[in-house]
Amino acid sequence: MYLLNQCPDRAVTYEIVCCVTSGETFAEEVRVERRGIPTLVHSIRRFYATRNAPLTDLRVRAEYDAETVALVEPYFPDLLLLDGYLYLVREPLLRAFPNRIVNLHFSDLMLRHNDGTPMFPGVRAVRDAIRAGCHETRATVHLVNAEPDRGMPIVRSRSFPVSPLVEELRARQAADVLRAYTFAHQEWMIRTVSGPLIASALRLIANGLVDLDAANFSGHDTSWRLEIDGLLPERSYAVH
């Protein structure tokens, strides 16, 4: 709701033309519609249930994404923003909006393996980073492609230091407390940076400061990297 309630750029730099939920309901539907923004319910679980298929069936996912395209096209969006959408995006959406789908991921997508794949992809990225011994975590807004969290980074958050208590918890084998800390750390990131970071990415895109068609990002070449300070108070972001 940051983009609706707090972002000064909405209706100035960008406009929200519709909201689509993959859930059964949309908790903020009334608030959104009061602002004149249509809300569309497109339940992914119901869609799969009518086809008697598991959520892992990517052929059905392609059908679902094709219906998503049909739902949003009448609103002529220039960009799709995924917010809490935890499913792989398939070809119908990628083809309809090439390099025009953005997502927020809770790890530093500049951290790459030698083959260019992200070190911490997926929904358990914060847990995996903490387990790997990282001393800080970051969030990244990135372009979406067919591979999970492998699209070009757009903007990166400030660092969130990992508590030194984690090492003590690990030494004591206090797995339950460590799980609780990991959850709290991710909530800290979500509540602090989610809305402002997405807004920063939208501002950069709307002002033409991001080359959305630089689709051949490999994760190896960082010569184009630019650090920008001051986009938000007391925060530093890396724009790619």
Please describe what each predicted stretch is.
Residues M1-H240:
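One-carbon transfer enzymes
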